[in-house]
Regions:
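Extracellular "leader-to-stem" segments immediately downstream of a signal peptide or signal-anchor
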Residues: 2-14, 19-120, 127-193, 198-200, ...
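Internal metal/ion-chelating core segments
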Residues: 202-260
Length: 260
């Protein structure tokens, strides 16, 4: 299938957000519906059920105070995520590098960014969500990007290809591991409960720990992951440079479709 499938609405939001009045209906799961590859006799993996996306339910993090000059944008990004109505909507991360994840800016005790049901988190081309450095990000086990109150459904985390990046700045964490420092990094993306998740068309690199975790004891199901590049240094690269415990995709629930 073609990579970097970009819906008209997402492109409009990134490149011409002020002119969003003529936005089209979000139709971004058509390709996924055709690519499920479900074996005969098996139930298909369900895809997110999303509302029509318009200017009224699209939220750019810059409008909530996020800045590429800021040391931390956690609170601004969370405000945009919280602004999504119960009926659903989309949060846009524009081009640029956006720091997040310092412990002092956390708005939750267990998650840094919390996404609620029926939300699309869209990283534009050239957008990087970069985790705060070791010693500033929490050393205790937290979820960096997860579901609000753990149980949410119909969530999309997407980009526009390999220039849409989530960067964990893991090198200092890995060195600390070799130096026997005490810390317990969580997953970069953890969808713990609920159902109908879609992660696609982006790159995750240099995470302190696991890249993506689906479910906790079977409590989450129906996840689709495709065209996601996961990049971590190999363990054989040598002392001070190798990544540690950076599993790609940990699956602990049923009905998960991973391809390309």
């Amino acid at each position: 299938m073609n990579k970097s499938i970009i819906t008209t609405i997402a492109l409009s939001a990134c490149l011409a957000f002020p002119m969003f009045a003529d936005a089209q209906t979000f139709t971004g799961i058509t390709a996924e519906q055709k690519a499920q590859n479900t074996p005969e006799g098996w139930p298909a993996v369900s895809l997110p059920q999303l509302p029509e996306i318009t200017a009224a339910n699209t939220f750019n993090i810059k409008d909530y105070g996020a800045s590429t000059d800021a040391e931390d944008n956690t609170k601004a990004i969370q405000k945009a995520l919280d602004a999504v109505p119960d009926a659903g909507g989309m949060v846009v991360i524009p081009e640029g590098t956006w720091m997040f994840g310092s412990e002092k800016e956390m708005t939750s005790t267990s998650e840094i960014l919390s996404i609620k049901s029926k939300t699309i988190l869209h990283l534009c081309a050239g957008a990087t969500l970069k985790l705060a450095p070791y010693g500033t990000a929490p050393l205790k086990k937290v979820v960096y990007i997860g579901c609000k109150n753990k149980k949410q459904s119909d969530i999309v985390i997407e980009g526009e290809g390999e220039t849409s990046i989530i960067d964990g700045q893991g090198a200092r964490w890995w060195l600390a591991k070799e130096q026997k420092d005490t810390f317990d990094p969580g997953s970069m993306i953890r969808l713990e409960q609920g159902q109908r998740f879609l992660i696609r068309n982006l790159k995750i690199q240099n995470t302190p720990g696991v890249n993506i975790t689906i479910s906790n004891g079977g409590k989450a199901s129906h996840a689709t992951i495709h065209d996601v590049v996961i990049s971590e240094p190999a363990s054989e690269i040598g002392a001070g440079k190798a990544s540690h415990n950076t599993d790609g995709i940990a699956i602990w629930g049923p009905y998960v479709n991973i391809y390309d």
